Each structure stands twice: as C-alpha cells, then as structure tokens.
C-alpha cells in the first residue's frame, strides 16, 4: 500500500514539474501580454472618467486583482474608491449577493457615485457597470492596441477579446476589509479544528470583494431590481487559506487536469470548482501532517471522488456561502458527462499512476 502511494506521489511530482510548471509559465506569459493591453485601455478610461482609476498593479510578479479563469480567460477586478457612505446589507435573500444602501443621514451628494444611486437609496452595481462599459468601448477605439482588442457585444459584462485568442472580463468592485458577511457567519464550523483561530482572524481581517457582475442566481433576469445587487467574492481569503503544505501543488495539478481533460461542452467545470473542493478537503483533513508531500496522492484522490459526488448530486455549495450552488444553471447533461469523465480520470490515476505521463 505504502509503495503504491509512493509511486503515485512520485508520478504526481513529475506531472507537477513537467505539465503544471509548463502551464504556469505559459499563463504567466499570456498575463503579461494581456495586462499590457488592459492597462492601456484602463489608462484611456481614466482620462475620460477619473473616478475609474486603474488598480491593475504588478506586485512580486503577480498582478493584484487578476484571476485566471482558464489559460485563455481572465478576470481583472477594478477597485473603486469611496464606499464609505454606504452600509453593506446582506440579508440572504439573494444567495451570493449583497446591496449597498446609503447610510442614514448621509446625503446623496456626499457620494462620489451620486448618479448611480437608485430612488430607494441603493448604489446600483448595474448602473455603474453600464457607465463603465460605455467608457471601455470608447477607450478600446482610442487606445494604442486598438488593432488587437475588441469589445465583446451581447453581454452586460465588460469583456474584451484580445488578439482573437484571449478573453478578459473587467469588473468594477469595492474592497471590504474589517467586516464579514452575515451570509458567511457559519464559517468556520465550530466542530472542525481547521483553520486555527489565528488564520481565521487573518482571513476575516482580509475581508472580501463586492463585484459588479451578473448575480449567479439571476442570470437571464437582468432587468429585475435585484440586478442592482453586488456579488460577493473571497479570492484573497481563499488564497490565504491554501497556504502551506502541498495545498497549492494539489490545486495546480487539479487545474492542469481540468484544462486538459475536463473542458467539456456546456462548460460544467471551471477552476473555481476545483479550488472550492480543495477547501472542503482541508476541512476533512484538518491536521497539517495530512498535507505533507507524501499525502498528495490521497488528497487528490479524495477531491476527485468528492467532485464526482457533487456532479452526480448536481450541487456544489460555495465554500463560504453554502446557500449558493456553484452548479446553478449548468445543463444536467453537461454535469453528467463531467461526472463520467472525472470518474475515468480518477480511476486511471489511481489504478495506473504511470498514466499521468500521458494525461
């Protein structure tokens, strides 16, 4: 048994140093190329409208606010200033979303975003995005990369196609630090020792983002009043939880396997599903020794089996917001074929670790 485990870990480490590192290097090169174009577009936006200041900065070879959706798809979060005059209201009526309401006694005129406040005093995510979309469309025509960048039509999101190969979504957002959403109040679960109290305090201080994008639960109902709501995102908190042990290596292997074998019609699976299931695996195996290099094969196997289970039940709860189902709106047939394909992949890796050479 131990010999089989060691063989799998050896093959996974080989897979990591060959396939995963090559994927990382290719993505890093793409990011540099894409960020040049996006920075130029955002510089042009800022000239027209100084309230939208580009926050895309490179720190230690990482771009703050940039998320890799897939090797050809990225999301850039554009942090907005001055959320202060609004109260964060998160009553759970819209899973995964919250609203920003003008604080009592505050005048609209005190807000930097006065014309985007609705009659009932809410700061409308949709109105801000609509204005931003207009500005980006104008900037694309003026910027120095106008020959290689186009705006993607037929969506309320701000999406660019770059060199006909890459898609970048630019999402206006507010950073919320020092508060924690009521809809995530159940975290951390009291009977689970992971993460420890110090890490929990760090994560809660890190806070979350409020994004101006289509709500998961409202896709296709854009005209409703609820489209004024903001989407909760916990990227920094999640990244902080995945520090230490073989967690980030495990995520890298999962992403690479997904990109190469689980990019299926109907797009049932993305890398965020992999990250979510890795967080649940951390809860199931709370001791740091469970995340030693020697356990990489066991942890990967556990996550793939959990993924199959989620696909078969057609439900994948968000890690911090369990009322939000990350499979919502995905075609059942796509989830079914993803379950079959994941099962084939897991069986192959477990019964014949050498097959990783070909995967």
Swiss-Prot record:
It holds the Pfam family Mab-21. The keyword Phosphoprotein does not apply. InterPro entries: Mab-21-like_nuc_Trfase (IPR046903), Mab-21_HhH/H2TH-like (IPR046906), MAB21L/cGLR (IPR024810). SMART domains: Mab-21. It is found in: Nucleus; Cytoplasm. Gene3D superfamilies: 1.10.1410.40, 3.30.460.90. Keywords: Cytoplasm, Developmental protein, Nucleus. GO terms for biological process: eye development. One of its GO terms (cellular component) is cytoplasm. Required for several aspects of embryonic development including normal development of the eye. Belongs to the mab-21 family. This is Protein mab-21-like 2. It comes from Xenopus tropicalis. The gene is mab21l2.
